[in-house]
Each structure stands twice: as C-alpha cells, then as structure tokens.
Amino acid sequence: MRKVFLFLIGLCALSLSAQVTTEPNPIPVGYTGTFKIIFDPMKGSGGMATATACYAHLGYCTATQSWQGVKGSWGTKNQPEFTKRTDGKWEYTINNMFTYFGVPETTPITKLVMVFHDGNGNNSKEGKGAGGQDIYIVLGQESVGKDLFHLFCSVYS
C-alpha cells in the first residue's frame, strides 16, 4: 500500500509541471485586468520544442460555444505573436480579455482555448496538449496541468 501511495504522489508531482500557465494564476471569471499566458514548448505534444517563432490560435469559450473570437487565420503570422523568454518559454500579455476579443464585459467567458504554431502555414510546427488535444485554461482554476493525475491529486492530497 505504501508503494502505491508513493507512486501516486510521484505522478502528482509530475503533473504539476504545466504546459501553459498564467499570471495571475488563476485568472478569475470576469477578470478585466492584465494577464500573461506562458507556454512551455517542451511540454505537451512537444511539437514547438525547436520553433524559432510562436503564434497562438487563441479564442475563448462560453458554456455553450467554443473557439469564439479567434484573431487571424490558422498557421499565419497574423495571429498573436508570443515573445521568447530567457527560460525558453513563450509569453503573451492580454490587457483585458473582453477588449481583446471585442466582446462586452457581460460575455460569460469560461475558458481560453489555444493551439500554438510557428507561423509557417500548412507546414507549421504545432504545440498542443500531450494527447494532441487543444489547450484550455479554465477561468477561476489554477493552470497547473489539468490531467487525470492532477485531478486525483487535488481530490486526495
């Protein structure tokens, strides 16, 4: 039993290393302030590990709709461009998500959704979640790697 418990603790520790984090973390529901999205290209699918540029196909979700408010076209350089940090991660600042997406502050934004690319059109490198899925930041929840193991850790730790 002790070995199983230690194994599960180890899995929890691994899952706390997130592919995408935010500052502040969490971003509150209805937040109108400035926040940063920080992307670690070495995690998740790892498809952007060697990229020299980083753009995001970035949108928002409500309870009933996904991928709303996306700027530009997939794979192009007319999407939000992230800045490379000295630690190898990529960063982007949004001053007010409602202004950014061009929607009223009464819009019930529940999540931000994103996929990263290097801006090379149909040949773009792609940064997604570990299973190849889109990346979601749930507003009001810490962005520390929302996988099954993290869910287990948050419930049982």
Regions found by a protein language model. Name each.
Residues A18-S157:
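Insoluble glucan recognition modules
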